[in-house]
Amino acid sequence: LEILKIIENGRFDLHLHTTASDGSFSPSEVVKMAAQKGLTTIAITDHDTLDGIQEAIETARKIGITIIPGIELSTKYKGKTIDILGYNIHETKELSSVLQKMRKHRQNRCLLIVNKFCKLGMTITLEDIQKYSKGNVIARPHIAKAVVDKGYAKDTQEVFDLYLGDGKPCAEDKMELSPSSGIELIHRAGGVAVLAHPLLIHDDIIVEELMQLAIDGIEVWHRKQSEEDSKRYKSLAKKYRKMMTGGSDFHNEEHEIGEFGFES
């Protein structure tokens, strides 16, 4: 899967989220939006779930767009969250079992976070959060929306800055694999493993260490990465002979599908 060779330049987006995790639009809606943008190939990469893939494939079949079944796996390394994208994933028993454990852990984590907010005098319930989580995955943006809804913060950014961001009073760790385990899991499910948004790791030494694992590629182009960043990651990809990919990391109307600074 040498992505940049098989895809017509500028007509793809390999990092998209739907309501199956923390996106605002259903898989069908995301596929239709991508088609309207003139994209020909997209990857659905929800956090720790494959739940949106089937719906996306069915919609894509009707409108003639190619779907790469994907995932964004949560892993942890040296205290940092490292997201690993998996492409051309098949739902194996092993993968389903790990994802089920991660889902249960997220649900328990959600209850712990709710409890922390309540202790700070901000009463929110699981029901408040489930209004925003349309899939099986409950993620922090869903909790943040419920907090804003109750009038405890002006917007979701404020919720993250004050309460939910890493190290903040209501933060709780999610279940995260090691990068090596995540990469192996993707490989055993027939997939290709790619390091997501390296800039967001905020440590190029760690990025280089990750390139020395059995990972297949790196997300050179991402909406938060400048041209300068992309050049740096391109050099790294060449140095370690890794595949180069790109995606918008689309979640909601604040982001543009297909816009991630890719230059052929």
Question: What kind of feature is each model-predicted range?
Answer:
Residues L1-K80, L162-P169, S181-A196, L200-H255:
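An N-terminally biased module of ancient metal coordination in phosphate/nucleic-acid-related enzymes
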Residues E2-I3, R61-E208:
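Extended substrate/RNA-proximal surfaces in nucleic-acid metabolism proteins
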Residues G258-S264:
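Conserved, well-ordered active-site substructure
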